[in-house]
Amino acid sequence: EKAFPLIRGAVEFYLGYLVPYDGYLVTAPSTSPENTFTASDHSVHSVTFGSTMDCSILKELFGNYLKACEILDITDLMDEVKAALKKLLPFKIGKEGQLQEWYLDYPEVDMHHRHVSQLYGLYPGNLIHREDKELLAACRVALDRRGDEGTGWCMAWKACLWARLGDGERALKLLKNQLHVTKEENCSLVGGGTYPNMLCAHPPFQIDGNFGFAAAVLEMLVQYQDDRIFFLPVLPEEWKDGKISGLRAPGGITIDFVWKDRCITECSLQSQTDMVRILLY
């Protein structure tokens, strides 16, 4: 009664917003948030068509709509959504080996831009999986090109991305960078970190960084894909012993577990509904 109408409304809007181009359906106009690129005539732009982030979000939206329809036994718009989903632009790899940010392989004006929008499908989305070796390598190149500096929330997002890429040590490095103490109150695109009161500094304060920091820690301890739960997927060396309780997993599962010397010694999963999950460790 609440969630489905929101999803359906978004689906209806984007079915009408997408336009055909070269055999695909793309968003137009489209941006990769706040980033700019250089066109073939050396002019600088931010608006184009078919950005990777747009396509990633729509793949997720349409996929979620189809799953919701199956659960609710609804057939409305299913054929249209399935057809549109098949025509959405696939991920593309650019000439530098990076996951492309736009439909065309434009060079970004700022290679170290704080946004990593083209990697939405890796995180927080769940479109690029551990079996997708070529795409994972392209994501790694794109993330490496961005660098490890940035605003407070940016470092949290990068930590989440490195965790998804299987690099716990790099993720931990980003978290430590984010814990850099700053007292800067004016708006700045560099020198991000954490204020003495533990609030994230863009600067100024942005709650994204605090939530993102916690999300990155959880990504390093537990990851999910379909009906699989991966325990300690990218545990950094400094965290060889630990305990976590009350972790909420997809499907309404509550997880508690303890590990020592990188080995799980206790584990409990609770759910209010019956379900089958594959536990990997």
Model-derived regions: residue spans:
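Well-ordered alpha-helical scaffold segments within catalytic/enzyme domains
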Residues: E1, F13, Y17, I57-L72, ...
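The feature captures the catalytic groove of carbohydrate-active enzymes
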Residues: E1, P5, L15-E80, T265
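Extended, hydrophobic alpha-helical segments in both membrane/secreted and soluble proteins
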Residues: A3-L15, C154, A171, T194, ...
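Long, well-ordered core segments of solenoidal/helical folds
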Residues: L6-Y21, L85-E96, A138-D148, L175-N186
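Carbohydrate-binding/catalytic loop surfaces
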Residues: Y24-S51, L99-M111, L165-G166, C200-D208, ...
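Long, low-complexity segments enriched in small/aliphatic residues
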Residues: M78-L119
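C-terminal substrate/ligand-recognition segments
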Residues: D110-N186, P203-E219
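Non-catalytic C-terminal accessory modules of carbohydrate-active enzymes
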Residues: E169-Y281
